[in-house]
Amino acid sequence: MPHLAELVAKARTAIEEAQDVAALENVRVEYLGKKGHLTLQMTSLRELPAEERPAAGAVINQAKQDVQDALNARKHTLESAELNARLAQETIDVSLPGRTIENGGLHPVTRTIDRIETFFGELGFSVVTGPEIEDDYHNFDALNIPGHHPARADHDTFWFDATRLLRTQTSGVQIRTMEKQQPPIRIIAPGRVYRNDYDQTHTPMFHQMEGLIVDKDISFTNLKGTLHDFLRNFFEEDLQVRFRPSYFPFTEPSAEVDVMGKNGKWLEVLGCGMVHPNVLRNVGIDPEVYSGFAFGMGMERLTMLRYGVTDLRAFFENDLRFLKQFK
């Protein structure tokens, strides 16, 4: 096998000249494949005497191993070069500024709710919540609202059946609280409520917050003082506030509260009154011992007045151009 060393040398040269993995594979097939030059050397062993064949076979196998080692080394080099070239193409320019992540902001109605909760929390009020699917007793009967009252009509209320409805006010939370807790009581009840109405100033779902105090010797003076302080804090100015006599089935006497707008006109902002004795009796509280006041206000209404929004529906349209103004 005088030319075995020559084959190995040629194989090494071909391996070094291979410029990619595909070309290297062709070299492997040419020398080590089933019909490769070095593989065919094994067929020449039959021409040798039997005693020389083991030594000759060992020489051929060593030559094949040397070529295989050279192939492996060259393959590693080529694969590393290909990987580095690919990484170079995919290199991230770290000097390029990243995309700015825009922070979100609270919805204007949420801002209003948080602001009001903070104010009344400092006065010792607790925040309580209740079910949005309510029964007619807690939504109407316990609040001294008779069966013939217009609020019970289908065109004003979303009914599920004869006794279950989407609550029209958060007053039911007050009833549930008074059923479970004896005075003194000092709570506010924010939440979603539902009315069958939709126009520029009304939506089928809106947010309401009601407040309640029940204790001994609570008077209308306490009610007026509390709401005066609240409105001046909320609007951040020394507003003119007036109380107009009104009617609500669950309070007596009742009033609606107006503030003087910048245009010189009175603007209604909330309703209030002294808790009706029948409401206290319905929850097992003696009206001869305890008295209380309640108030209720629409969160969208107050938000519109605070920020000068003219169309209530804008709060529910998810228009970022509108919402970004309140960040």
Curated annotation (Swiss-Prot):
Its EC number is 6.1.1.20. PROSITE patterns: AA_TRNA_LIGASE_II. This is Phenylalanine--tRNA ligase alpha subunit. Tetramer of two alpha and two beta subunits. GO terms for biological process: phenylalanyl-tRNA aminoacylation. It comes from Pectobacterium carotovorum subsp. carotovorum (strain PC1). One of its GO terms (molecular function) is ATP binding. Binds 2 magnesium ions per tetramer. Keywords: Aminoacyl-tRNA synthetase, ATP-binding, Cytoplasm, Ligase, Magnesium, Metal-binding, Nucleotide-binding, Protein biosynthesis. The keyword Cell cycle does not apply. It is an enzyme of class 6 (ligase).
